[in-house]
Amino acid sequence: MEHTPRNAGFALPAAYMSTMTSSFIDFLKAEAPDLLPRARVENMPAVPGGGSAFEPPHGTTIVASTFNGGVLIAGDRRATTGNTIASRDLEKVYVTDAYSAVGIAGTAGIALELVRLYTVELAHYEKIEGVSLSLDGKANKLANMVKGNLDGALAGLAVLPLFVGYDIDADDPKRAGRIVSFDVTGGRYEENAGYHAIGSGAVYAKSSLKKLYDPEADADTAVRTAIEALYDAADDDTATGGPDLVRRIYPTVVTITAEHGAVMLPQEETASIAESVVRERSERPGQLG
């Protein structure tokens, strides 16, 4: 009796088994370009005078700062459509590999696709090459992805990530945390001040960080400083959501250190800090901003 192989008729195309490139994005460009974030932009209906036919939700404020032995990134949870709150609990900060994380501002849907694809890109590279990308390599990968959305940015669908990472090859482990920002053309910028913010509330968050930032602070102090900066941003920017004690919605925070790598803080921990900040501010209303 003739034996039929179990996988007969289900063989993957040769391209799926190729190791010619360690880039998952290059693979998608060749085999399934419709799955790239830019495809969504290209397929959106146009309106007279340019732009898109609707206003999608936008993510708002992300802050980052270095501390003694690491770096952190934090974001509020609000997304807006015009002057309307589109979401109160959007996650905008993501761990992307063992020693890096990304926060997203801008067009929410495209930004979420971009950061998920970026996470797969880093994992794919490590599986093919057997080593992870250097920190500069990770930042350059993300810059190229942002550049790939330039048409979307010109159509009003911009995405701006904020990248943080711990450089395991740094000479000084205490100063190994790094922050990299980007513009819509894919330009990447090292933020050597030790802190940065992006999004609609960035100017208020950076003003707060400028007063509170301490490069010698430990991780706990740095987390509180970041949450205070988001609180200050929400106090003046309607598109930034502050701690919501009623709904129990609090900022998202990721810390990165040599010992623990990239770790998303449990909500219970951020809730405790956020509630402490709100309580302290309510006790000294003259200093609310």
Curated annotation (Swiss-Prot):
One of its GO terms (cellular component) is cytoplasm. Pathway: Protein degradation; proteasomal Pup-dependent pathway. Residues 1-59 form a propeptide. The formation of the proteasomal ATPase ARC-20S proteasome complex, likely via the docking of the C-termini of ARC into the intersubunit pockets in the alpha-rings, may trigger opening of the gate for substrate entry. Interconversion between the open-gate and close-gate conformations leads to a dynamic regulation of the 20S proteasome proteolysis activity. Its EC number is 3.4.25.1. The keyword Lyase does not apply. Gene3D superfamilies: Glutamine Phosphoribosylpyrophosphate, subunit 1, domain 1 (3.60.20.10). The keyword Nucleotide-binding does not apply. Its main location: cytoplasm. It comes from the Bacteria. The active site is at residue 60. It is an enzyme of class 3 (hydrolase). It catalyses: Cleavage of peptide bonds with very broad specificity. One of its GO terms (molecular function) is threonine-type endopeptidase activity. It is found in: Cytoplasm. Keywords: Autocatalytic cleavage, Cytoplasm, Hydrolase, Protease, Proteasome, Threonine protease, Zymogen. One of its GO terms (biological process) is modification-dependent protein catabolic process. Belongs to the peptidase T1B family. The 20S proteasome core is composed of 14 alpha and 14 beta subunits that assemble into four stacked heptameric rings, resulting in a barrel-shaped structure. The two inner rings, each composed of seven catalytic beta subunits, are sandwiched by two outer rings, each composed of seven alpha subunits. The catalytic chamber with the active sites is on the inside of the barrel. Has a gated structure, the ends of the cylinder being occluded by the N-termini of the alpha-subunits. Is capped by the proteasome-associated ATPase, ARC. HAMAP family: Proteasome_B_B. Component of the proteasome core, a large protease complex with broad specificity involved in protein degradation. This is Proteasome subunit beta. It comes from Saccharomonospora viridis (strain ATCC 15386 / DSM 43017 / JCM 3036 / CCUG 5913 / NBRC 12207 / NCIMB 9602 / P101).
